[in-house]
Amino acid sequence: MSRIDKWINEKEMPNLSNAERLIALLYDLGIASLDQLIILTGWNAQKINQALHDIRNRVPIPATFKRDKKILAMCKKGEIKLSETERLKLEASLKDKKAKLDKEREKWLVAYQAHKTAKAYYTLGAEGIRYATLMRREPFTKWKITPRQQANHYHGINEILVRLRKAGIKENDWLCGREAEQELYYYFNRYKKRKKLPAKTKLYYRPDAYLVLDHQHDFFIEYDTSSESPSKLKRRFQNCLKLYQALKEVEAKLMPPIVWVTVRESRKKRIEEIAQEVLVDFKQDHDGENIIVPPSVCFVEGEDTKFFAGQIDPKPFWG
């Protein structure tokens, strides 16, 4: 069973509420839309919306807010009389209390849209992250909070998994970038110890996700929104090669192929060109060494599903 599924499965985690299950899932996904949550949980929209509501309601409505809201409603119905000054003062007070309540609730769950007609995205706030780490017995750090500016990136990563599910392909496992990083650090720390590198040396490269289809097919996943500059892409490819060289000394056999997914054909070609350029330079810089080059392919969104289903056999740009 996939690690993200165990939090949703009532037999695996019988004591969790639906709100807690969704907190755990959002922690893995980073940012997700309602339609993605429907596919990945198997719940209907009503059940998900109720769970989202319950997460936000972990911050209860203050009694004074309820009281003032009731008074204002009675005033509008003519059941009680307030002077114009009293009414305006009450409305201002309610508006202020509502803003404070929303701010506190966003510490658990943030819902936002790029504009009024855009798709809504959901992500955990600091308290939601803290609660998720408690359930997982992980340390809490603020860097685990997902920046909302990366909504398109996280949505694109999640769509890779959603397309698989829609195609009837059930993964054996799916790790978000954070969890994949934790797995890699085990081997990277062994490498650091062997090379006597400083303890603070950071992992050279972290994939966006790790997909296991079965015991013979697993992949690192990279999703590209086309927002990264060529220089950033070059550093990413260079750091990827750097990590594969480092880990070949401790556990090279566990390093899987890499699947890149991007938004359009022209971007795909550019990614492949940059990757080839970096590889040529890397080999020149490591002349005489046995370079480990991970088999890597790139797809426009949608083609990746055909690849995972075994329907196409693309030419890799590396490996």
Describe each region flagged by the PLM.
Residues M1-I145:
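Nuclease-adjacent, charged terminal/linker segments that flank catalytic cores
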Residues S2-E10, L16-S17, L40, R58, ...:
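Electrostatic, structured charged patches in enzyme active sites and in nucleic-acid/phosphate-binding
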